Amino acid sequence: HGIGRRQRQMCIRDRVLGHESTGVVTEVGSAVTHVAPGDMVMVTWVPRNIESETQPPAAAQLQVSDGVAVSQNVFTWADHTIADQQYVVKVDPNIDTDVTAIIGCAVMTGAGAVINTAKVQKGESVAIFGVGGVGLSAVVGAKMVGAHPIIAVDLDDEKLAFAKQFGATHGVNAANEDPVAAIHALTVREVEFNFSQQPVSGADYTCDCIGIRQTMEQIV
């Protein structure tokens, strides 16, 4: 939502878009050793952790009919793409591409926020606002580390039911009830008390997978 507010965020036209995908390698450069033609790979906007390559490579530039198009770091909205090896990861060809295609952003963002950024521990509570692709990935990440409860918050009952299939222990429809009150009710710690001698409540960690003012205020 803040794109264009700072100079470094200004978009350069013409631009080629897309930042996650799965495809088959057709050709590699002479310095590329971790993948080969014929390999199924994932293209992601996050560079691989290569000690010898600490700086992300420059944006790709493509000659088009009426000028030059530039990408942020990768582009995937195309039949073919050219990517620096830092952004290419080999994947199991037996996994459906519908699954691997979203790992490069949605899964890494949601699950990564829970596992790597927040470092949620077993038994800690997590509330996740918005259970689309990123939110569902956060739910899976929370389940993987043994979080409890895992509270999914959304406006769609169908999505909330789907989130439970991924590991959410509770679903809160924010269109029908106050999500803040619901989260407090589900996270009461009977052995901890505040200055008013009331049981402490509230999620240990909350993930905002929507990014609007209302959810941010509710989370805070």
Identify the role of each PLM range.
Residues 1-12:
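Single conserved hydrophobic/aromatic residue that forms the stacking wall/gate
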Residues 17-88:
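Glycine-rich phosphate/adenylate-binding loop and adjacent beta-alpha elements
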Residues 34-37, 109, 122:
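Short, flexible surface segments
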Residues 69-78, 95-116, 129-137:
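A glycine-rich, Thr/Ser-enriched phosphate-binding loop motif common to dinucleotide/cofactor-binding enzymes
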Residues 94-97, 119-125, 201:
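Short helix-loop-beta connector
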Residues 128-131, 143-218:
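Adenosine-nucleotide cofactor-binding segment
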